[in-house]
Swiss-Prot record:
Keyword Transport in record: no
Highest taxon, organism lineage: Eukaryota
Record family assignment: Belongs to the GPN-loop GTPase family.
Residues where GTP binds: G13, S14, G15, K16, S17, T18, T174, K175, M176, D177
Descriptive protein name: GPN-loop GTPase 3
GO cellular component: protein-containing complex
Motif (Gly-Pro-Asn (GPN)-loop): 72-74
MF terms in GO: GTP binding; GTPase activity
Amino acid sequence: MPRYAQLVMGPAGSGKSTYCATMVQHCEALNRSVQVVNLDPAAEHFNYSVMADIRELIEVDDVMEDDSLRFGPNGGLVFCMEYFANNFDWLENCLGHVEDDYILFDCPGQIELYTHLPVMKQLVQQLEQWEFRVCGVFLVDSQFMVESFKFISGILAALSAMISLEIPQVNIMTKMDLLSKKAKKEIEKFLDPDMYSLLEDSTSDLRSKKFKKLTKAICGLIDDYSMVRFLPYDQSDEESMNIVLQHIDFAIQYGEDLEFKEPKEREDESSSMFDEYFQECQDE
């Protein structure tokens, strides 16, 4: 039997730990057993029980206090993750060999772990050797994405992780429950975006022709390949959480021995799910 894993990624403050905690609760309500592994050696606290915690192996504070190393916060975290990559046997012992495991890996937020270093790619390869089907779950804060330039930046960060890890990836806008009604209306256009329409919004204030040309090329690339789309994640709405889980389950073919249906909103590129979600928000 295969095992299943979500690699929960995203910038610091995007809600990775909150996502793990709420997704575990949601799965428990569905009578599904889901475990969490903390892979952030700089984590201070989280609202979920863990089956493994990288801080039992190595902590950033201990590395920074080592006078022979003299690392700062970022250097210390990189050292910790490279040490972790050299000690995957520790993780293997923590995970055990239970079939049909479903595990969320709460990852650090530093983008250089996905763009400059091989650590996360090595982790994916190791999990696959242990017969895990791995899906990347990339989170961005919806409050950060309400402007065109910030949205494009978020897409590039998600695309960077996707290209680096070469695994199925579901991209999520978190903290939808914290947005005002006006902000929710603004964010709706970013969930299934017309990149050329966003291009007009984002380049109107640019003075440099070179930057306008670059932005146009980026928007064209994103639109032509349609590789990055975002799903809304509202921890106060069970339907929103269930739709996200369905997409992830489909990506890793969770429960493939059962009759499995592709998430219905994929039948139409301009999905009705977004309309239903925002209509409910407006009716509240």
